[in-house]
C-alpha cells in the first residue's frame, strides 16, 4: 500500500509541472507551463569568453541588460560560470511578467506555449 501511495505522489508531482525542452547548437531551453500558458523558461547557453573574465561582473552586466529588456520582475535567476575560456549562463525568466512577449514570437496577451513553440522551431530549435 505504501508503494502505491509513493507512486501516486510521484505521478501527481510530475504531472503538476509539465515541461518541454528545446535545443540548438549552443542553447537548451526548458519551458514550464500550465495548459497553453508558459510559467517560466530556463535558458542554458554557452558562449566564448570575451574580455571580462570575472563571473560576478558578467552576471551583473547581464542582469542589467535582462532587467532593462524584459522588466525587473521577469528575471528570476541568473547563474554565470566561467570555465575553459567559455561562459555558461543559466537564466530563468518568468514569462507571465515579461513586458514584451513579441520578442519571443508571442502575439497573444498571455505567454502562449503554442506561439512560443512555433517561434523556437522557426529559429532552428529542436524539441527533445
Model regions and ranges:
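Subset-of-secretome marker
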Residues: 17-128
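C-terminal motif of bacterial Sec signal peptides marking the signal peptidase cleavage site
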Residues: 12-15
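Positively charged n-region of N-terminal signal peptides that target proteins for export
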Residues: 1-4
Amino acid at each position: 500500500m505504501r508503494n502505491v501511495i509513493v507512486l501516486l505522489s510521484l505521478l501527481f508531482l510530475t504531472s503538476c509541472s509539465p515541461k518541454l525542452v528545446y535545443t540548438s547548437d549552443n542553447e537548451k531551453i526548458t519551458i514550464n507551463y500550465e495548459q497553453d500558458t508558459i510559467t517560466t523558461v530556463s535558458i542554458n547557453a554557452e558562449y566564448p569568453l570575451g574580455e571580462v573574465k570575472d563571473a560576478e561582473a558578467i552576471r551583473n552586466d547581464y542582469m542589467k541588460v535582462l532587467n532593462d529588456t524584459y522588466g525587473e520582475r521577469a528575471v528570476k535567476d541568473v547563474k554565470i560560470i566561467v570555465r575553459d575560456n567559455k561562459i555558461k549562463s543559466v537564466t530563468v525568466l518568468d514569462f507571465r511578467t515579461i513586458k514584451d512577449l513579441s520578442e519571443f514570437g508571442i502575439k497573444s496577451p498571455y505567454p502562449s506555449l503554442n506561439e512560443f513553440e512555433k517561434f523556437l522551431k522557426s529559429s532552428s530549435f529542436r524539441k527533445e
